[in-house]
């Protein structure tokens, strides 16, 4: 007999509301005995096995969750692309496209990102990317995939893209340090897990 269910879903930062639980868990019987948590909490529990530590999630979005010695969580980031998940693959792709546009308009550095995007999307120049990225099917996960495709094509040989990636790493590191400090997690060695 199952006494309690725990279900995780994206976009939930704390314990879910009754409405969220009913909407997302209504088919699980009995849903009143179901705990609905954010996907980062589930990821944290899987990575740390419930012990104090840090989970850095950096994929389509970016978030950091820290569990301290008192089993209290600090969660930073994870606000989604409209509110700028700094350091995420989505963020990297947008920065790369912006760098290509700046290159095209002669307002930024020369970069192989421009020709790479033209080759990947079989477009004459970077202006051709506009209808593609504004198409409803070009979702944020496709931006994230684009970051990986650019990285693979450039093979670490483009200074502008390397700078974007270094900036992404710096932003994620700053977010992680801030989360650890806010959580008052002062243990050594500090268990840090990465996902994404």
Show which residues each predicted segment covers.
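ATP-binding/phosphotransfer module of carbohydrate and carboxylate kinases, centering on a glycine-rich
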Residues: 1-4, 26, 47-54, 98-196
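Short beta-strand-loop/turn "lid" adjacent to the catalytic site in phosphate-handling enzymes
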Residues: 1-35, 48
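Short, acidic loop-to-helix structural element flanking the phosphoryl-transfer center
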Residues: 16-19, 60, 177-180
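Active-site phosphate/pyrophosphate- and oxyanion-stabilizing loops and adjacent acidic/basic residues
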Residues: 23, 42, 115
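Glycine-rich phosphate-binding loop of actin/hexokinase-like ATP-binding domains
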Residues: 51-108
